[in-house]
Swiss-Prot record:
Spermidine binds at H64, D88, D158, C159, T160, D161. The keyword Transferase applies. Belongs to the spermidine/spermine synthase family. It catalyses: S-adenosyl 3-(methylsulfanyl)propylamine + putrescine = S-methyl-5'-thioadenosine + spermidine + H(+). This is Polyamine aminopropyltransferase. One of its GO terms (cellular component) is cytosol. It is an enzyme of class 2 (transferase). Catalyzes the irreversible transfer of a propylamine group from the amino donor S-adenosylmethioninamine (decarboxy-AdoMet) to putrescine (1,4-diaminobutane) to yield spermidine. The gene is speE. Its main location: cytoplasm. Its EC number is 2.5.1.16. It comes from Yersinia pestis. One of its GO terms (biological process) is spermidine biosynthetic process.
Length: 296
């Protein structure tokens, strides 16, 4: 067997996954992080930041469809959407499929990610960067939500893991800013890691979000690239009814939106809020914290 170059993910200290590398398309240390894009025979083009896989061509649709269509169809009347992160462009691609949306703002801390992904991962954005409804802001997400006077109907935090530049997007000061930046009836969602291996992330997010939102939960999807089982997405709103929509309502909204998805459908939407018992147990034993330290 011919010797192939192997790339090892470094997210976990004692176990993990590796990828065979057919061709390194791009490698550079940007202003904020180490970025590499390479080709894998099974997963297509793969992007990693600081040693952690962020996205692959093969299965990115699962992640991006669930991060966008669940909150947008649950809301039902979203006009203004804010994406935090999302420099690869796929979240923008999925949001832009909703024709009733009037404005899409994306705040990305690293201009290099946007530039290089447009060149080396063009299928992710699929032309969405040219959508006239789209506005790109190069800024830190925490700074943006705490400085802006705009209000949004849905906020999607397409953050990395809570290390490096992404760490601030798991803090109380960020969640407070997001709550303040939502219109009445608005929804906040965020990636929250693989709950079997990163359960503390979900517990910490739940604890902090509960200070600013009356309904906090998670939904889930299995995404092969993210090693360790199902990925959880944080869900936060002031209206618990948005998490409990019946299947018929979602089917009607899905049909009206005219979406054709590869993973998402209304039944998946309803079922995604069913969580494993070990996570439910962890969330029900969260210690109550008096006061909020905005630096955490």
């Amino acid at each position: 067997m011919s010797q192939k170059e192997l790339w090892y993910e470094t997210l976990h200290a004692n176990f993990g996954q590796y990828f065979s590398v057919e061709n390194v398309l791009f490698r550079e240390k940007t202003e904020h992080q180490d970025l590499v894009i390479f080709e894998n025979p099974e997963l297509g083009r793969v992007m990693a930041l600081d040693g952690v896989v962020q996205t692959t061509e093969r299965d990115e649709f699962i992640y991006h469809e669930m991060m966008t269509h669940v909150p947008l169809l649950a809301h039902g009347q979203a006009k203004k959407v804010l994406i935090i992160g999302g420099g690869d462009g796929a979240m923008l691609r999925e949001v832009s499929r909703h024709k009733n949306i009037e404005q899409i703002t994306m705040v990305e801390i690293d201009a290099g990610v946007v530039e290089f992904c447009r060149q080396y991962l063009p299928n992710h954005s699929a032309g969405a960067y040219d959508d006239p409804r789209f506005k790109l802001v190069i800024d830190d997400g925490v700074n943006f939500v705490n400085q802006t006077t705009e209000k949004f109907d849905v906020i999607i935090s397409d953050c990395t893991d809570p290390i490096g530049p992404g760490e601030s997007l798991f803090t109380s000061v960020f969640y407070e800013g997001c709550a303040r930046s939502l219109n009445e009836g608005g929804i906040f969602v965020a990636q929250n890691g693989v709950c079997f291996l990163q359960q503390d992330e979900a517990v910490n997010s739940h604890n902090k979000l509960s200070h600013y939102f009356s309904d906090v939960s998670f939904y889930q999807a299995a995404i092969p690239t993210y090693y360790g089982g199902i990925m959880t997405f944080a869900w936060a709103t002031q209206n618990p009814a948005l998490r409990q929509l019946d299947l018929a309502t979602l089917q009607n909204r899905f049909a009206q939106a005219g979406l054709a998805c590869r993973y998402y459908n209304p039944a998946i939407h309803v079922g995604s809020f069913a969580l494993p018992q070990y996570l439910l147990d962890a969330l029900t034993t969260i210690p109550k914290v008096i006061g909020v330290d905005s630096s955490e």
